[in-house]
Amino acid sequence: MAFFGLSRVSRRLLKSSVSVTPSSSSALLQSQHKSLSNPVTTHYTNPFTKCYPSWNDNYQVWSKGRELHQEKFFGVGWNYRLICGMSSSSSVLEGKPKKDDKEKSDGVVVKEASWIDLYLPEEVRGYAKLARLDKPIGTWLLAWPCMWSIALAADPGSLPSFKYMALFGCGALLLRGAGCTINDLLDQDIDTKVDRTKLRPIASGLLTPFQGIGFLGLQLLLGLGILLQLNNYSRVLGASSLLLVFSYPLMKRFTFWPQAFLGLTINWGALLGWTAVKGSIAPSIVLPLYLSGVCWTLVYDTIYAHQDKEDDVKVGVKSTALRFGDNTKLWLTGFGTASIGFLALSGFSADLGWQYYASLAAASGQLGWQIGTADLSSGADCSRKFVSNKWFGAIIFSGVVLGRSFQ
């Protein structure tokens, strides 16, 4: 139950609104027992709204698909419908990091409020969630290979181009959002059957497929504006990645290796970043960099896929989590080792300094920690390990910058 620090005024309001006397206590318990056997939906009125009218504006989540939720208030059971889907978790009110993005209570999924629910106008919340703006880890994972490549393309003794890093950062945000929109449009029949995804905007009915297609058009148009800032070679190379972006969501229906296909897609920036700076490709440098990203993706996205493995079996979709099974950590160790090896080969071809190899040692430790400590039976722990990969990317980037700057 969410903890409410009560002021004197609030306690007075509560006292006047909820008073339990010995004579009424038994009646309340009897009525509560009766309500449990024959549930009646009533509306819960937060006493804070009498003193602070903005309370509901800040902490109510306007979304669809919420069901009856039971809460206990000072020892008295109350049945009420979560008005507009307000979460009962204390992490939102107290500002603490949430352990998981959902809680289950008797089969009911309660979604925690994000900054989108608290601060954005109601009209745009669905679109912001469709682009996963409240979950930036996907943008980081798409952006880091681009940044590695841009830093590798810098001249010896120089820092990477801030112009290209800014362009690719914005491009990563837009392309990741477009990829999520495409994924939700193609997977809406699957998302409704998986606990983790059933509240996504299109699957839950918050947005229609037509609205999703219109939003996708806007995302791609903005992405085109960024692509046109690059040279002709990079424009063609960047546009060719759309085939992978549109194909990836379908792979889980046909192969146990959709994570490998995601690796080919999300690490395309390892090729594009270099060509944007240099105007051509250097296979001995960027191909090992690209392959290292693919192997890295197989590590983190397999860990991520273990969150949904039970639902995947029920729905009939495939993943490396199901393919590897009990041997997952052995496979991940192999892919992690290959990723570090390809990174070392790329750095050697680029003639980077010793600072780069020191960063590889640190990145190896981070990746080994992920694989060694991941609890693949815990969705929350898999999610935490997945999110930690932004630090792996940051370590490699810092190593490339230092190795090139002191070259």
Swiss-Prot record:
Q: According to its UniProt record, which reaction does this protein catalyse?
A: an all-trans-polyprenyl diphosphate + 4-hydroxybenzoate = a 4-hydroxy-3-(all-trans-polyprenyl)benzoate + diphosphate
User: Where exactly are the transmembrane stretches of this chain?
Assistant: 137-157, 162-182, 210-230, 254-274, 279-299, 330-350
- Which EC class does it fall in? transferase
| Gene Ontology BP terms | isoprenoid biosynthetic process; ubiquinone biosynthetic process
Cofactors demanded by this protein: Mg(2+)
Per the record, the major location class is mitochondrion
Protein name, UniProt field: 4-hydroxybenzoate polyprenyltransferase, mitochondrial
